[in-house]
Amino acid sequence: MHRSKWVLLALSCLLVIIAGCGKANNANTSAANGNAATGGQTKELRDVKFVLDWSPNTNHTGLYVAQAKGFYEEEGLKLDILLPGSGGADAMVASGEVPFGISYQESVTQGRTQGVPLVSIAAVIQHNTSGFAAPVDRSIKAPKDFEGKTYGGWGSPVEEAVMKSIMDIDGGDVNKVKIINMGEADFFTAVKRDIDFAWIFYAWTGIEAELRGEPLDMLYVKDYSDKLDYYTPVISTNEKQIKDDPELIKAFLRATSKGYQYAIQHPEEAADILLNAVPDLDKDLVIASQKWLSPKYQDDAARWGEQKQSVWQNYSDWMYEKKLIEKPLDADAAFTNDFLPENK
């Protein structure tokens, strides 16, 4: 459920990949609009690829619901959901290898300031559900309590910058935290072996901890600064896709929005659909996670997927202040609500 450990490496490779590819797949730019069935005649469905950021989980449920319920077929589309390749989802989307994928505001921001043409077209979750988590026996109740503890991460400069930001607010010193790369170990293995806390999405790892009977102290980063209440994850496309085939994006988001709306209204049924599509997932975890996460997809937004300019501006300003990006972001170009369906 956490972001890829190779985000920075993938971003560094994107410009090379884009230069090599330079064009969208012909299948992504061919005309194939309209419903799957009209007037008794069946039209050929248009194949559309979507790449996940990680293994399937409840961040992705709306996609699987829309696929199972035929919402994509109603738009004349046949969705193929892919796992990311070695270069990562952002590279695949930015290069035009696939038209859509899961990304994060953080990586879209980093990418765009390096000339990578990613654009966020929908927020999967309206508010940041991530934060620093520790078993309760580590007595981490506030950011200052990170002092003297060991943090396990994936090696991104963003981690220490966020930690420093919230520790500064609480009067703590980030230099008193031991930071290590936890590698491929999962959270539960790592906290038993060599770390005290890590950055998690509560909807997955936090819910799993509840089911295991291993209570956590959870410090949500958004609770310490409005600038850290950013969109994670998002659905992204690339600038060429927007220019060449905006109607495909509209059709894709009409179906996807229906999938997430269904998951909001029917979390248990949506969980069953995800489990049917990915039977290797833990049933109890998926159901409990879906119940926790479904209300948070849209939350206080006017419609699912909607993004605010202020959220993009605030977070990119924070990244620039912390020297995580080399120049300010043109926030208006980094996202768009133009392709989301209007509320009915």
Where are these regions (language model features)?
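Short, low-complexity disordered leader/linker segments with a strong preference
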Residues: 1-46, 342-344
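Short, glycine-/small- and polar/acidic-enriched structural segments
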Residues: 29-183, 188, 192, 196-200, ...
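Short, solvent-exposed loop/beta-turn-alpha elements that line the ligand-binding surface or hinge
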Residues: 74, 144, 221-228, 296-309
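Short, hydrophobic secondary-structure boundary micro-motifs
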Residues: 75, 120, 271-273, 327-329
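Short amphipathic alpha-helical segments at helix boundaries and their inter-helical linkers
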Residues: 98, 102-103, 295-306, 341-344
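Pocket-lining segment of extracytoplasmic ligand-binding domains
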Residues: 106, 186-189, 193-278
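Secondary-structure end/capping motifs
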Residues: 244-324
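Conserved C-terminal helix/tail region of periplasmic/extracytoplasmic solute-binding proteins
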Residues: 312-344
